[in-house]
């Protein structure tokens, strides 16, 4: 499982049926790979909930999202598992089947909520417009395999 965390001043996701937005917090781009499990979702959710990605008065990254009353916008992103080794068109065989991936994606979002976080989401498996107003920028990539952070 791969999650790109971007610290944002604001972010939104829209399509024909959806309009979700947050102010200060994280925009998460969430990729579910062939081998991704609920254990991977758990360890990444814990890391994100406790990650100190906001500055204190000395410009040190000392505050987590809860301490800043931030929110999360979680967007599924199967293209994080693109295979670009051959040719010019990416392949996506490393991404988990959508029927299985959506279950892990929803489990992951619920795991974040279990830490008391406000989580808004995109719509799994649809084309969306994602607007991200980065803060910093601060961008961290979390990867887990076999329930362990890589």
Swiss-Prot record:
Pfam families tied to this protein: Tyr_Deacylase (PF02580)
GO CC annotation terms, alphabetical: cytoplasm
Keyword set, alphabetical order: Cytoplasm, Hydrolase, RNA-binding, tRNA-binding
EC number(s) given by UniProt: 3.1.1.96
Catalytic activity: glycyl-tRNA(Ala) + H2O = tRNA(Ala) + glycine + H(+); a D-aminoacyl-tRNA + H2O = a tRNA + a D-alpha-amino acid + H(+)
Functional summary from the UniProt entry: An aminoacyl-tRNA editing enzyme that deacylates mischarged D-aminoacyl-tRNAs. Also deacylates mischarged glycyl-tRNA(Ala), protecting cells against glycine mischarging by AlaRS. Acts via tRNA-based rather than protein-based catalysis; rejects L-amino acids rather than detecting D-amino acids in the active site. By recycling D-aminoacyl-tRNA to D-amino acids and free tRNA molecules, this enzyme counteracts the toxicity associated with the formation of D-aminoacyl-tRNA entities in vivo and helps enforce protein L-homochirality.
Subunit structure: Homodimer.
Name the record gives this protein: D-aminoacyl-tRNA deacylase
Organism of origin: Staphylococcus aureus (strain MRSA252)
Gene behind this protein: dtd
């Amino acid at each position: 499982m791969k999650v790109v965390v971007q610290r944002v001043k604001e972010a939104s996701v829209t399509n024909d049926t959806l309009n979700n937005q947050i102010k200060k917090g994280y925009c998460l781009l969430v990729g579910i790979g062939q081998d991704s499990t609920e254990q991977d979702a758990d360890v990444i959710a814990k890391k994100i909930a406790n990650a100190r990605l906001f500055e204190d008065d000395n410009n040190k990254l000392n505050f987590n999202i809860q301490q800043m009353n931030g929110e999360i916008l979680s967007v599924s992103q199967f293209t994080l598992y693109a295979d670009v080794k051959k040719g010019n068109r990416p392949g996506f065989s490393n991404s988990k089947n959508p029927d299985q991936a959506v279950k892990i994606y929803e489990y992951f979002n619920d795991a974040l909520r279990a830490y008391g976080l406000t989580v808004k989401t995109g719509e799994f498996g649809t084309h969306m417009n994602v607007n991200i107003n980065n803060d910093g920028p601060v961008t961290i990539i979390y990867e887990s395999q076999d329930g362990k952070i890589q």
